[in-house]
Design a protein with these regions (language model features):
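Intrinsically disordered, low-complexity, charged terminal extensions of DNA damage-control enzymes
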Residues: 1-19, 24, 187-342
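Catalytic cores of DNA base-excision repair glycosylases
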Residues: 3-8, 12-196, 202-211, 278-280
Length: 342
């Protein structure tokens, strides 16, 4: 059974694989950048970001020497900025510890900041041809259906079990084509809903299809609580300039944005702001609400325009200057909404 699975999948992949710029290279640095960008972001959306990033930082050394703000600016719009910070720190680590050359062993790659087993496996198999499994959601789904596994794929022990199955399937075969074949199969045919079994190159070996469970499997039950948060978000202006701060920590660490507090009233906002910055505000107008959804939380930002009557020590920006800053996607939404209503 196994030999037919591998031959069928690799033959199908070689004929039908999708064409993306990061698939045209064996450069581990480029593959690493693409894999990090593809986390939590759709493939089509990544293409222009990847292209710009690689054109600007075509070597690890250039990335390591860049400022974090420059890296964030190129990342702007992709979200999950912690990924960009880890990339920057990891590039510096590689320059300091590997003479600017990307590591060549699975262990060394896995030890890099921001890289987990899937990304390490993908880099090793695609760049170096190693027989290392790359287990993402697509692979978990395919293997669960192929072997009709009833285990919860959200659990680490199930993921370990599937990794072992893939490791055995890889022995003696083109690891790069096999791993990428699984990814492409999951993205285009063996999809979460309504799998296109009639087009699947390995459907004749699929136990879930055989017992009519392909739309039921895999079992995936996650215990995640999604938070709903309400903020008063302040558009604070002095004449035609805007007050923005660089977030020192948290979800939007190092990104620029408007000041906001998890409060229920703009008047409480004014009190909190004056207490923190020793500067009085005047309430000008209300501009509605903007929602921004993160993976495990949703922000409901209630937008109020405040003004300050005199110059302060805090940094103020003209609109054209804001466009040059690495601003969080959530607060770019706020600004766009405000300007539309202004």
């Amino acid at each position: 059974m196994q030999k037919n699975i591998q031959n069928n999948l690799i033959t199908w992949y070689n004929k039908n694989h999708r064409h993306f710029p990061w698939l045209e290279t064996k450069n581990p640095y480029y593959i690493w950048i693409s894999e990090i960008m593809l986390q939590q972001t759709t493939t089509e959306a990544v293409i222009p970001y990847y292209t710009r990033f690689i054109e600007t930082f075509d070597t690890i050394d250039k990335l390591a020497k860049a400022s974090l703000e420059d890296v964030y600016k190129l990342w702007e719009g992709l979200g999950y900025y912690r990924r960009a910070k880890h990339i920057h720190e990891t590039a510096q680590f590689i320059c300091e510890n590997f003479h600017g050359q990307f590591p060549t062993t699975y262990k060394d790659i896995l030890n890099l900041k921001g890289i987990g087993p899937y990304t390490a496996g993908a880099i090793c198999s695609i760049a170096y041809g190693m027989s290392t499994p790359a287990i993402d959601g697509n692979v978990l789904r395919i293997i669960s259906r192929l072997y009709a596994l009833k285990d919860n794929i959200a659990l680490a022990k199930t993921q370990k079990k599937i990794a072992q199955i893939v490791s055995e399937l890889l022995i003696g075969y083109d690891a790069s084509a096999f791993n990428q074949g699984l990814m492409d199969l999951g993205a285009t045919i063996c999809r979460p809903l309504n799998p296109q079994c009639q087009n699947c190159p390995i459907v004749s070996f699929c136990k879930a299809k055989e017992i009519g469970q392909q739309k039921v499997l895999p079992i995936s039950i996650k215990n995640i609580k999604h938070k709903e948060l309400n903020y008063i978000t302040g558009i604070i202006t002095y004449q035609d300039q805007y007050l923005m701060i660089q977030n020192p920590a948290g979800l939007l660490e190092n990104l620029y944005g408007f000041i906001q507090y998890e409060l229920e009233s703009p008047y409480r906002f004014m009190e909190e702001f004056e207490k923190q910055y020793h500067l009085p505000l005047s309430l000008v107008s209300y501009h509605g609400q903007v929602k921004h959804v993160f993976t495990h939380r949703t922000w409901h930002m209630h937008i109020y325009h405040f003004s300050i009557s005199h110059l302060c020590n805090m940094k103020l920006y003209h609109l054209e200057d804001i466009s040059l800053l690495p601003v969080s996607t959530a607060h770019l939404k706020v600004l766009k909404h405000y300007l539309k209503q202004k």
